[in-house]
Amino acid sequence: MQIRNILVICVGNICRSPMAEYFLKQNHPNIDIESAGISGMVGHSADDKAIKCMDSFNIDMRQHIAKKLNADHIKKADLILVMSQNQQKHLEQTWPFSKGKVFRLGHWQGKNVPDPYQHDQDFFNETCLNIQSYVSDWKSHI
């Protein structure tokens, strides 16, 4: 199956999922990639610390606006990347039709992506590097 639409999910859609979204867009410019939050902080911009991390990769996330996950996002996506096993279970229980297309971003390394929200810049930087690594792991599978 050819992947045309990728959805990246985290809790608030202001830290992890936008970072992954923007890294994926850089690697896959011809794929429709978006992000959303399970309990999205609707209308908020990306966290300043996340923006600072991404700036170091010359990726500008200042235009990101958080949105809340809904069934239409799930239906449209060919691949859904989440940050943890708990998020995967939540999606598959809430939207059973999502089974088979929901994977952890860190799937290939067997890792969850801890939430950096309200942590210091160093934690954000480490999270950003992990996300970049996990996104790279997906390159040969997309």
Write out the residue ranges for each language-model feature:
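Conserved active-site segments centered on acidic
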Residues: 1-75, 140-141
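Phosphate-binding/catalytic loops
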Residues: 79, 85-142
